[in-house]
Swiss-Prot record:
It comes from Aedes aegypti. The active site is at 394. This is Molybdenum cofactor sulfurase 3. Sulfurates the molybdenum cofactor. Sulfation of molybdenum is essential for xanthine dehydrogenase (XDH) and aldehyde oxidase (ADO) enzymes in which molybdenum cofactor is liganded by 1 oxygen and 1 sulfur atom in active form. It catalyses: Mo-molybdopterin + L-cysteine + AH2 = thio-Mo-molybdopterin + L-alanine + A + H2O. The keyword Transferase applies. Pfam families: Aminotran_5, MOSC, MOSC_N. Its cofactor is pyridoxal 5'-phosphate. The keyword Transferase applies. Keywords: Molybdenum cofactor biosynthesis, Pyridoxal phosphate, Transferase. GO terms for biological process: Mo-molybdopterin cofactor biosynthetic process; molybdopterin cofactor metabolic process. Belongs to the class-V pyridoxal-phosphate-dependent aminotransferase family. MOCOS subfamily.
Amino acid sequence: MEAMMNFTSQYTVEEALAIEKEFSRLKEKCYLDHAGTTLYADSQIRSVCEGLAQNLYCNPHTSRTTEDLLDQVRYRVLRHFNTRSSEYSLIFTSGTTASLKLLAESYEFAPEGAFVYLKDSHTSVLGMREIVGTERIYPVEREQLLKELDSSERSDSEHSSLIVFPAQCNFNGVKYPLELVRKIQRNGISGYGKERFRVCLDAASFVSTSFLDLSKYQPDFVCLSFYKIFGYPTGLGALLVHHTAADQLRKKYYGGGTVKIAMAGRNFHVKRDPLVERFEDGTLAFTSIIALLQGFETLERLVPSTAGLRTIERISQQTFHLGRYCYNRLKALRHSNGNAVVKLYHDTGFEDQGLQGGIVNFNILHEDGTYVGFAEVSYMASLHNILLRTGCFCNPGACQRHLQLSDEDVLKQFDAGHVCGDANDLIDGQPTGSVRVSFGYMTRKEDIDCLLEMVEKCYIRKTIANGFTRTQIVSKYKSYDQPRLKMICLFPIKSCGAFKVTTRWPLSRRGLKHDREFVIVDENGVALTQKKLTEMCLIRPQINLKTNEMTLSHPSMDDFVLDLDLLGESQRIKLCQTKVCQDNVQAIDCGDQVAEWISVALQTSGLRLLKQSDEEVRTFQQSKQEIALANQAQFLLINQASVRWLADKVPDWDELHEEPTLESLVDRFRGNLIVETPTSMEECDWKRVTIGYLEFAVDGPCSRCQMICIDQGTGVKTTEPLRTIGREFKGKMRFGIYLSHVNPLRDGSEQWLYCNSVVEGLSE
């Protein structure tokens, strides 16, 4: 057992150093989502670019040279799987999903043929049910499939049925014995009489780090994606068809290059004879296909074959040992009361490389055994520069089985608002998904240690705190008998520092005047936030309403004054588009001078400052009120009393070098309206709010992310208070409430919010 708790690299020291040099762009990030996509090497991309720059690659329908090169790539791919073109035809597709769809559309079932699929399959396999040419569609459980290894009943029917199962489950990396292929082809499936089955192997997850030997195991169809193996190119995959199964496919649609003749005036055509030429519609992604050669070359150079072991077999060894190290280390973690910190979702204990790939799936448990939501874990991982995957990973069957959810449970979660890919991670205390980490040939032991350190730091409570708790924070502040508006905060530039107002501020049709009116974008036009650049909080805008100027300050820069009058719609301006919270937004470029100032301040070249166009109309579906560049509401209300209560719940501020103040904690929540009430959390019951003479509707609670773990005064990341919010609210990462103005004036007249106004919250 002690040996399994340690990790021994399968690479030489020289190999490990050469690999690490190829991925220096990771810097301090720990990438642990190789089941999602592995990473491409620096030299791989340079080689691809050099090839494109030095060669003339024409359309393969134009140039025989390009066509011959594509054939060489086909041979190289088949050789990787230890087979040749006399055994398998390789049809290029856009990926595994497209391969499965093509098979489902083309497979010719006999009148009584059945389509059978493993329940623990990818969503793309489940989607085949909608278009296969048979009504006999059946799922098979994992246990039932494995029983076919012992089957001896031979199939002699002419019925042509089809079964699809993965070589490796993308949920937790369990491998299915490839002996099943031959067994099912010969004996059929128990419970289906004498029906003859052809086998489709979903190999996408398996071939990323394991050797698929098609000379030993010969499924009728194999589906895969190349980015899982090489990281680049994306949007390219293959359907491998065994020559004995080629006649089972009947193509319906035909595109360019797939016919001998096609007539425009008559509905007549004749398809080409070779299978590949019939099925590859239009012009192939030929430059991407050619790039596969650099992928193979890079793998074999960085992880060279040794006596008796191919490159991919060595990679399989390395990733298995990484997975076993991670699995056993997580399994050994304990809370102070002896309870497990992690619940693992596995079908093996990482004893056998032939039965387990380099994927570890788990959820984290609190000390009392309750679940930590996967969204919270994802936020914490992001704070620690760890990239991992959460959810159900497009494998609802495996997810449901391991989380022990009935069909009724899944439907109940859906009715409660949970959908695939959202952050609704706990419903009634039960998880809707989990956390997955996965490993590639370039993964280091240090990457896993970073994950383990994060889990221990964030979820194993220490017995001694450093003393920065409520006693010190509360003593400096008094409570108020009547709720009042203490401060107005606006954020002129999205994700930058706050402009704090303690007197009064005007409203616009979008919320606070000038609030989140500007956004910083990178050289690709992508909006930046503190999730990517925490230093953005150090840029602090100030608005002068009299002069209509915005002054930008930064600790290391001279102030920059931007004349807002020069950004009017009537001026000669540069309009552009960016995307904010999934919305396309029309904006005005604020010019080169401020762009240069921001780029220097944030030490990032190519940044631009954009202002939302006055003509832009952006709304959020729940309130229907116009909003600026805020995430989803006109206003965010934060209660100081609730922040104080939350601070009392934080067990340890060990990442801070000095005692936190209430003001600094309030700043983390980036609220617009800072109120003080006699009791904490009473805002959670409000449905409507009156502040002075203005009325607001409550749009709902604010879901929090890792942004609240950034100290707005320094840009330093901490694990609190997000960790405590997740624990105190049973995984619901909510704090603060969204408001929208009920009766905004649209005739140009101004309405004002006044600090120290009485706040009245109505619960009905």
